[in-house]
Amino acid sequence: MATTPAAAFEALMDGVTSWELPEGPVPSELLLTGEAAFPVMVNDKGQVLIAASFYGRGRLVVVSHEGYLLDAGLARFLLNAVRWLSPSPGAPVGVHPSLASLAHILEGSGVEAQVHPEPAEPLGVYCISAYNDTMTAELIQFVKRGGGLLIGGQAWHWASQHGSDQVLSEFPGNQVTSVAGVYFTDTYGVKGRFKVSKKVPKIPLQVRCGEDLRQDQQQLLEGISELDIGTKGLPSQLLVHGALAFPLGLDASLRCFLAAARYGRGRVVLAAHEGMLSAPSLGPFLLNAVRWLAKGQTGKVGVNTSLEKLHTLLLEHGLECSLEPHLTSGVCVYCCTAYSDKEAKQLQEFVAEGGGLLIGGHAWWWASQNPGRSALADFPGNVILNSFGLSILPWTLDPGCFPVPSADSLNYHFRKALSEFQATLNLEGGNLEKNWLAKLRVDGAAFLQIPAEGVPAYASLHRLLRKQLRLRLSGFPAVSRENPVAGDSCEAVVLCLATELARSGTDCSELAQGLGAWSCSSNLCPSEHTVEINARNPSDDAWMSTGLNLPNGQLTEVCLCEAAACAGLKLQIGCHTDNLMSASKLSRAPVVTHQCHMDRTEQLVSNLWGGLLYVIVPTGCNLGPMSITIKRAVPAPYYKLGETSLEAWRSCIQESPAPWGELATDNIILTVPTADLRALEDPEPLLRLWDEMMEAIARLAAQPFPFRRPERIVADVQISAGWMHSGYPIMCHLESVSELIDETGMRSRGLWGPVHELGHNQQREQWEFPPHTTEATCNLWSVYVHETVLGIPRAQAHPALSPPERENRIKTHLEKGAPLCDWKVWTALETYLQLQEAFGWEPFTQLFAEYQTLSDIPNDNPGKMNLWVRKFSEKVQKNLAPFFEAWGWPVEKEVASSLACLPEWEENPMRMYI
């Protein structure tokens, strides 16, 4: 049986070489939503006039005028439709009396059909017009149980009699077909030329109809002037992408935190954090939401047991509701969180058949715990929500109190913005505000992460964008440091959409032809290489360099053994992992790296922007040494201390066309432009110095040396935050490259910044007191490395550590009364430096080691600070409580009393200031 849209379309169009439509009937345009519906016939204006869909175990074919079901010129298609709809070959076909002549057309094609007033047993297929309003429930259940429904009609005449503003929800045919994502609209279908498509036609971006969703927005926001989400957790941003979905709560940048949608016969309201569903400040909105979801029904509201506070709020306002562990029958509205997809299908059917769903949750925490996985595809809430045209994004939104959006703000919609963007690219006008462009950049990139394979609603949009971007090739943004583009420009949107299209599986070789400077030339001669890596990793996920570069847009084939394919390895293309989606100006595309799971022995993968190739070995992997064959890549400059010969290095840097190269030891790997490496005749002295510094870093941190996982520093044309930032990898600007690879300069001038970031990577939450020490204790490593390895005293290592500067900071802090809120950065560092100057580095090293073995460490700053006071005092056998109190630390009486038995610290440097 044809169970996919592509196979279904092929079955429906078998032998249909032309559309012989009768001239008389005026059809209605069909609106398709959800993930199951797909077009079958589309006119030259892009209007869908015949569609098909799946629901439950059954199927539907929807025709935009009943006259099409009664015309012998469509006999071949009608025969195909009945055969495809049939749950089994030869299943009985019933025809409603209003379509009696259809039975004759089918019989003329060899299909026995009988006139039946209703879809009773043992019928497998039932044919009916869209005007019957007495069998809605029976028809839905007939399809849900596995039957096939052929239904035809137009809604424009009904709308003229009953009002266009009710057509989607009240037109009889929509009461049935909407459960499967197909709606008759009041818009006339143009009777133009009809091309027979070879594959599933595209679904239009927008379909206009008389029913205005702004009425729903007004009902949900009635009596509300502001939406206060400031106290109930950190929300995610929401993506509103369905044709019948709409925003309700927006911040000043159009980032959405409340949204709603119609779906089938039901409705959905989504909050970007479950805490919003119990916030007293949102009480009026929540009551509006439940009433809107109920659509005037008097049934019970079911509240999941995870939302007890919401249950209490609803009871207080007189609503009949009950706590339920899961969705139960008999409720008209169900309220739950978005953290489980066990009931995804049941919830979708509940809404499709008329239920109301109030749901809330965020995806940012899930994304942080599932690196490498797409929240749009895999987050449980999105498994439920995507088909409703709503999704929860892995990005946060600053909470606060926001005014109810203006009508203009609520007018923003992803599909509308994309339609205007398309018109702009086609030089057909287009009217996109700057804030719409900035929002479209984020929304478009997010939408393209929803898996599109086998889902016409998403695949159609992918096809549309591919076509637009291919037409745009000659003007593809040549973004670079010399030619940056604004974050709220059409060029930025193109960069984002092209990147995500390529990441979603689109062949990007054609797109890559229009790239500018941020790439390795595709005119190289890539070849096959076998590389050896050590796939034993006791530490966190580690990038293993291959020494290879993939040209932009090039498709590479990766081959590995069965054992490796089962080891959880990933392939990463590119090392510039900073996401620049929030940047106001772009010197490169926002996302230029790509990861994929290496779960097959042979795999094809590409990246629009090319990049160095890495194998990511997961923590705990014990695979050991292994070989990987990589085709169509080029060698990149790579020097490993103790392994690469000088001859091989010099040959590589002169010949390699790759734009980036790496210098590596067992403890640190530097990724810098090849152009900078060409001046480095012999990397060995430089890397030996780096290893000395890394050994010092490990020594102070009481960590093993060599490092369990080498640290990485990557230079980039643009990074996401600051001059440099810590992490894996540490990121820096190109201006910092010279200090990273200049041994002479490092020894004479030092390199405070890079070691500062390496220090950040050594900080541990057990003895960190954010935000006070975040930018302070990391500098202990900068001081230590400069003094013990580079021979540069602290007073010369950084201007802020000159004696006058230090003394002035102490006096200023004490003159203010030593407020803890001001104890940060250099002021906080001074406390630690005074301890080090009195007691040396050994107490620090010993404490860092001891903290690795401690349990039951407090989670709050006061608790952690008092533990540090006690531990450091015990380590040096001096009562340091007065010293820390002088700095404004909240030393508890109990701690001070316990330390009173220790000798007084007579040399306390703070005495002279008090």
UniProtKB/Swiss-Prot annotation:
Keywords from the named record: Cell membrane, Membrane, Transport
Presence of the UniProt keyword Transport in the record: yes
Record InterPro entries: Class_I_gatase-like, M60-like_N, Pep_M60_3, Peptidase_M60_dom, TCAF
Domain of life, source organism: Eukaryota
Peptidase M60 domain: residues covered: 541-840
Record flagged with keyword Membrane: yes
Example GO molecular function: transmembrane transporter binding
Places the protein is found: Cell membrane
Cellular component GO terms held in the UniProt record: plasma membrane
Protein family: Belongs to the TCAF family.
Subunit structure: Interacts with TRPM8 (via N-terminus and C-terminus domains); the interaction inhibits TRPM8 channel activity. Interacts with TRPV6.
Function according to Swiss-Prot or TrEMBL: Negatively regulates the plasma membrane cation channel TRPM8 activity. Involved in the recruitment of TRPM8 to the cell surface. Promotes prostate cancer cell migration stimulation in a TRPM8-dependent manner.
Name of the protein in its database record: TRPM8 channel-associated factor 2
